Amino acid sequence: AVVAEQLPDSHPSKKVALAYVQQYEKTYGAGSRNQFAAHGFDSLVVLEKAVPIALKSGKPGTKEFRAGLRAALETMGRTEVSQGVLNWTKDDHWGYTMETGVMLKVVNGDWKVE
């Protein structure tokens, strides 16, 4: 997300990363973006996808909802977020796929995609 504009147009995260940058910097000012706020943004992207699925299992706050949320996360498939693509499974709770990694280099104090 900190290098959103530098990502190639074909990068799966570019659209979401640019949305994060636009929303965040509109609120906090140009140049204020950071990877930590992007993690929070990405969490909301994931929840917007998972919660409607989990609600079919039960009401929020119940054991059924929590189980439904876990099941949704493990089965909802590929989710593009500002810092990569997530695809959790029952056996993989890290979830980040290898397809979206980029190498960054600091040049004159700024991050640059290599």
Q: Can you describe what each PLM-predicted range is?
A:
Residues 1-114:
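Extracytosolic ligand-binding ectodomains
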